[in-house]
């Protein structure tokens, strides 16, 4: 389970949120939980106002949008199967998370 791996959402909201992406650093790989950001179906979310905060991806033919405001920690055993990786888009994801934690809007 590496940073930016994409897993199926095995939870009860899997219809609208089919996937999650692991965002926590591999430094914490021995911890039994993973910090993930939901990848919400593009057709199940209101129009995106900030593309840099909610970048779009296609996973297994499904158009999804990163939803950093729903970031969560889940036990590793609750993650579904790995279906891919967004490591090639790592900077896009980190930039979205930087916006979430920005102090520029005090």
Where are these regions (language model features)?
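Compact nucleic-acid interaction/catalytic patches
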Residues: 3-6, 10, 14-56
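Short N-terminal helix-initiation segments at or just after the protein's N-terminus
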Residues: 1-7, 42, 82-85, 100
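C-terminal terminal-subdomain/extension
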Residues: 57-106
